[in-house]
Amino acid sequence: MTIFRPHLRFLFKPHFLYFQSPAGQSSRPFSTSQILRTALDMPPPPVDTTQRLAKLRELMAQNKVDVYSMQFRYTIKAPLIITVVYSFFFFLLLALKLCLRKTAISQSTLLHVMGVETLIRITAAFISSFTGSAGCAIVSMSKAALSTDGRYFSQAAKQLDSNWTLLKRGVEGVPTWEEWTAEQAENGKVVGVDPSLITAGENLHYTPLTSVVVTNCSYVIADARKLSQTLKTTGGSLVGIDQNLIDAVWGNERPARPANQITVQPVERAGKPFEEKVEDLRKELAAKKRSAMVISTLDEIAWLFNLRGSDIPYNPVFFSYAIVTPSVAELYVDESKLSPEARKHLEGKVVLKPYDSIFQASKVLAESKASASSGSSGKFLLSNKASWSLSLALGGEQNVVEVRSPITDAKAIKNEVELEGFRKCHIRDGAALIEYFAWLENALIKEGAQLDEVDGADKLFEIRKKYDLFVGNSFDTISSTGANGATIHYKPEKSTCAVIDPKAMYLCDSGGQYLDGTTDTTRTLHFGEPTEFQKKAYALVLKGHISIDNAIFPKGTTGYAIDSFARQHLWKEGLDYLHGTGHGVGSFLYAEVPLSASNVLSNEPGYYEDGNFGIRLENLVICKEVQTAHKFGDKPFLGFESITLVPFCQKLLDASLLTEAERKWVNDYHARVWEKTSPFFEKDELTTAWLKRETQPI
């Protein structure tokens, strides 16, 4: 989806996608995926939000709340990936979040940071009708505003009704959501945050309030600090609120946390025994002279212990915490979820503790400090993405050192087994996409079938299921025709999606989770006769894609520098796109990673013309060290190995718009696509013919 920006798309620290029922009351189990999909069946936007806003303001007045602000960022892909899944549960959630007494900002940097973000987005969608994956909704007694970034300008403009003002993030002259909130909360008003839903790194003054607020959305790390500083300029302040009303309001209707089974990621696919990973972490603790690390990031826990779950849609993680000391590794998880294989995997090596006991255990850890014999400073290591409440349980600043998690860095560097898994799964996934595109063209052109965007996405899933080691999609498929392709994180819904027009551009962004790796591929096709401008725009995007693929740069180069390689050709024509050129990808996990050898990243420049079409060309690449004639400063140089194997659209390829070197790149790439994928279609004449045509030299 969207490379090279130090951001948030896939590094996700989720926490509770569930709420427990009070003691003595039954809990209703639920399927996370089912809930996510149910929520997507919302009325066609825009929705008239007048009554909802009136009710919100009524509750705000009753509770003496001047401003209600809710920042959200989902983290899965597809419009988003997490970009991707969107709404549901609004009514109960909404009601709750309104019961505040002070100015309230609802965030989503939860304890784990991802699960509840989904619920927040649901609430945000309900109050604003905007279903995008990132933004901030702010409501005062007389105004309502929605701030979002360039990926969602088009979508927000379509979904917001006249009650709302769209704050286009990054556009000159448009206030940030923090500035807009400060304007509404001036003259001594208070903005409240739930300490379990904000990162520990904020070091905000903790002032418990009798009435609460908040909920979640991710990555408020810098935002909370910035908001706090901004509020001070108008006399406002930001405080921690001790209680969360969601549990109280939801009552018996609150769903239980997922009880999906946890399985083992065998060392043949993980590439390294979990015992060695734990020992590596202990060495890191010793080097930093820390007595323990408390881990709350779900993908880090799954990676560390070579375990996989399915508590978060499209992401093989499970709700848990972990504590690693020089002598003990503890996993806080619902034991009933562990498969017999997983129990045996951990037996005698990891101490299992109840999931809900993590805060009490953290308090005990803080009280005991580190043993004198350990030689440590007695402080505990905590990720700077962990919740403020977890930091407080460990004793706060005097006991905790908040840093970039060493596990994040360790898992970002894929080992050879993981890299080989990526290469192999991309061959199979490439074959699946080739089969799909061949089928789609035949159905539309030869058979004259009427297929909508969801029909296409469903067929692709059906095809992928036939290929070895397929687990499921890695995000909701973006199947978009014509103008819908211009909505960067478009999510087709059966009730409102368009019929695929063979005379228009078709953009398909999809990915699969395989036992040996994760895929993410975008191709833009045309089944009829594209315009000259469409072919030119396609060539400009392809040139940028090739520039990234051919890039060679010294180790330590920032992503921003490389991002410009992809945009340069569009810039020369006065064109651009409003998303990053790529993102990091996990190994049957999710992760946003910096540029380093053995990282797996996406290369996906694009161009979008509102109301007309969108173009995006995405391959996954492995960052690797390359040989150069010289090594300036004795630094190694890095480059990329493209592992995606799907041809580019011949009807959109105009060889005259490419240089000789670019044409050679395309021909070499297509030759490799044919070599690797054609054996899958020895008995499939339709797909073989399509693949042969699409990979012919230009």
Swiss-Prot record:
GO biological process assignments: proteolysis
Swiss-Prot/TrEMBL keywords: Aminopeptidase, Hydrolase, Manganese, Metal-binding, Metalloprotease, Protease
Q: How is the cofactor bound?
A: Binds 2 manganese ions per subunit.
Sites binding Mn(2+) 1 sit at: D520, E604, E618
- Kindly report, in one word, the top-level EC class recorded for this enzyme: hydrolase
Xref: InterPro entries? Creatin/AminoP/Spt16_N (IPR029149), Creatinase/aminopeptidase-like (IPR036005), Creatinase_N (IPR000587), Pept_M24 (IPR000994), Pept_M24B (IPR033740), Peptidase_M24_C (IPR032416), X-Pro_aminopeptidase_P (IPR050422)
As its record notes, the protein acts as a catalyst of: Release of any N-terminal amino acid, including proline, that is linked to proline, even from a dipeptide or tripeptide
Obligatory cofactor(s): Mn(2+)
The highest taxon in the source lineage is: Eukaryota
What's an example GO cellular component term for this entry? cytoplasm
Which residues are involved in binding Mn(2+) 2? D509, D520, E618
Output the Pfam families linked to this UniProt entry. Answer: Creatinase_N, Creatinase_N_2, Peptidase_M24, Peptidase_M24_C
Give the enzyme's EC designation.
3.4.11.9
What's a Gene Ontology MF term here? metal ion binding
- Physiological role: Catalyzes the removal of a penultimate prolyl residue from the N-termini of peptides.
Q: Which PANTHER family does the annotation name?
A: XAA-PRO AMINOPEPTIDASE 1
Q: What family is it from?
A: Belongs to the peptidase M24B family.
The protein depicted here goes by the name Probable Xaa-Pro aminopeptidase P
Organism per entry: Trichophyton verrucosum (strain HKI 0517)
